[in-house]
Structures are given as C-alpha cells and as structure tokens.
C-alpha cells in the first residue's frame, strides 16, 4: 500500500482501536505519534515498542493544548502527513438521569476533540498540499441505540463533520474520511461483552449480524485504516466506511 515514510499523529492511541492503528501503521513503516490525555505511561509503553514512535500528552478538549501538541509533534516527527482522530468516550446516557457534566464530557471529547485536532493541523496540511484525516465514527451514527443517545449524537456529528470537511479540504490535497466500527473488542466497551445484565442485548446483536461474529477486533479496524491512508484510496473523500460485521446491512 506504499505508506512507508509517512508520519501520523493518533489521538487516543494508547489503547483500543487507536493503539491497533498505531501498531499497524508502524509495521508499514509509518512514524507514529501516540497521543494520550490521562494514560501517558501506556502511550509511552506502546511507543517504546514501535520503531520511530513517540508519545505525547494532550487533552483534546483544550484547543490550546492541541495546538501545542501539533507543533511539538511536527518538530519531533518531521511533519504530519496523517491525522487519526481516535480519542473518544462511551457510556450510557439514559434520558431523565444523565446530568449536564456527563453530556458535556462526551460532547467535548468526541466532537470538540475531533474538531480541535483538525483545526490545529489543517494549516500545515494545506501548506504542504497533502494530508490524510481519518475520523472514528460508529455504526450508531446512522442507527439508534437505546440508552446511548448522546454517544449516537456525537458520532453522527463526526460523520457529517467528515463530509463537510472533505468538500472543503479536498482542493488542498487533503483526504478526509470516516471509519465507523460496529461492536469492536476494546477496553472502552468491555461491559457490553462481560456484563451479564447486557448479555440479552449482545445475543440479539449477534443474531442480527450476518457474519455471526459477536464483535470485530481492533486489528480489523486498523487494517482498514491502513488502506484508507494509502494512495490506493486516493478517490475517497467524505466516505463513511461501515465496518460492523454486516450488522446494519439489514436495517
């Protein structure tokens, strides 16, 4: 796929899909910057295990911190070709019992954090007339998931942000696309796979999944991203790639 020699900045890169993407891109010869907000030690451990990788700390909710991050990563990596917006949170927000702090935290990390990173890196990518931006959406951006209305809303916002930015940035040589996973085995959604109270929901999801898989792996998602940031995907702008084991195909 000829992505060796590129550089990538990955928010939320210390675990889950972000970590898998960091490992996959590094295996292809990409120099990766792994960003964590509260788990810097894990980011440093991941970076230490990968050739040419570096760890950075930044709270994606803080636009000034993200601007500093982009500047620091640019100097350390020698530029940034690829931005992966993988930072995010996932938890239930039932109507009637969700406080404003829980609402704001999810919106700020998932939506504002994605925007902050893109807003900070866009001038550099425009100047070099080259860039690949991959946002992490979700299958629930396009279908409902009871009890998780705020999460659904954040991911729908990211999908539409992707489409609008693709129109804006494509003339500058920048590709903006979105990967929307289905149920993927990561620490963020461990409760769905292990909580006995949620087993009926998981059983229904499995029954409705054509592949018969209860979940995808983070590595499955990373393999798709490796293609999306390659020249082989040069015709893709504003795409929302659903990778959900076929769960949404019949909806």
Where are these regions (language model features)?
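Active-site helix of classical SDR
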Residues: 118, 154, 162
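Short C-terminal tail/terminal secondary-structure segment
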Residues: 2, 143, 207, 226, ...
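Short, small/polar-rich loop/turn modules that mediate ligand/substrate recognition or access, typified
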Residues: 170, 175, 236-238
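Substrate-binding pocket helix/loop in short-chain dehydrogenase/reductase
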Residues: 94-95, 99-107, 205-206
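Catalytic Tyr-x(3-8)-Lys segment
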Residues: 97, 198-220
């Amino acid at each position: 796929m000829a992505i060796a020699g590129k550089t990538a900045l990955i928010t939320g890169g210390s675990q889950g899909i972000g970590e898998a993407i960091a490992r996959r891109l590094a295996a292809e010869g990409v120099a990766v910057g792994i960003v964590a907000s509260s788990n810097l030690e894990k980011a440093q451990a991941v970076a230490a295990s990968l050739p040419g990788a570096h760890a950075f700390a930044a709270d994606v909710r803080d636009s000034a911190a993200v601007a500093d991050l982009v500047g620091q990563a640019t100097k350390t990596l020698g530029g940034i070709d690829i931005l992966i917006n993988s930072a995010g949170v996932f938890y239930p927000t039932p109507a009637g019992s969700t406080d404003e702090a829980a609402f704001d935290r999810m919106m700020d990390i998932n939506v504002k954090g994605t925007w902050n990173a893109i807003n900070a890196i866009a001038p550099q990518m425009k100047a070099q007339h080259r860039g690949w931006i991959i946002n992490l959406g979700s299958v629930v951006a396009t279908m409902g998931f009871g009890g998780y209305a705020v999460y659904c809303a954040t991911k729908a916002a990211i999908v539409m942000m992707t489409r609008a930015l693709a129109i804006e940035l494509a003339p500058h040589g920048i590709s903006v696309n979105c990967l929307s996973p289905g149920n993927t085995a990561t620490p963020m959604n461990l409760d769905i796979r292990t909580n006995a109270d949620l087993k009926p929901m998981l059983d229904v999801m499995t029954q409705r999944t054509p592949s018969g898989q209860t979940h995808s792996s983070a590595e499955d998602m990373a393999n798709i991203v490796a293609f999306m940031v390659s020249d082989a995907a040069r015709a893709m702008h504003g795409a929302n790639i659903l990778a959900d084991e076929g769960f949404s195909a019949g909806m």
